[in-house]
Amino acid sequence: MRYLSVAEIAKKWDVSERSVRNYCAQGRVNGAFLTGKIWNIPENAEKPERINKRKEEPLTLLDILKEQKASKYSGGIYHKTQIDLTYNSNHIEGSRLTHDQTRYIFETNTIGVEKEVLNVDDVIETANHFRCIDMIIDHAKAALTEKFIKELHLVLKNGTSDSRKDWFAVGDYKKLPNEAGGMDTALPEEVADKMKALLTEYNAKEEKTFEDILDFHVKFERIHPFQNGNGRVGRLIMFKECLKYNIVPFIIEDNLKMFYYRGLKEWDNEKGYLTDTCLTAQDKYKAYLDYFRIGY
């Protein structure tokens, strides 16, 4: 085996000779030995890592969303998520704004239309939904609570025509019975207890799986705790929980709408309907991550 001097190794490793001698004296260079006062170092010896050098963990999607949100970075995954999630989640619920109009509101905080009538609530709820997405990014790691869920609803419906109705509780549970997709939901007097039980059951699980998140969503939608806005709040919760547990999130688009509704309805009999629908949506979001070179 060929041995090199301290000076030769220092040049090879691009460090000072003093650092090389310290590494050798600390026993951190395999095969190095002294001949008198001269260190003999194997030519294939590897440079020791600095003790205080912290191994960098790869950034998660949540880390990147937080960074891009804070820096107001345009054209990245945060920008795309805000527009696509808002447009699709509102569109499922009947919003008539186009994808381009949604993007324009996000990018400019204005909307320009010619020879077209827009529903004011569609515009307000779009702007509000952007704020809701910021909330789930900021609080992604926090435990899911009734308080947070109610805050999402409050922000989503703030300033809408619903908020001016006496019988509509903004940021609180429903006052009147309602149905979802032709199915009965929890009665107003049952909602608080059912929500507490659902959250207790869900939060008792230390690590949530993809199926756990979908199961919570189904049960949440069946309770239908709010007078209106349950679907959007429910999908925001799913996105938040995926971020928390480093699961690739997903956006239910219009072409998946009927499969999504079927999955909610048939969950007890066949979990595969909803699971496959959400996995299809997840594949599309993975394509976004691939494009932006974000690992998952």
Each PLM stretch: what is its role?
Residues R2-W13, E17-V29, L34-Y296:
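FIC/Doc superfamily catalytic core
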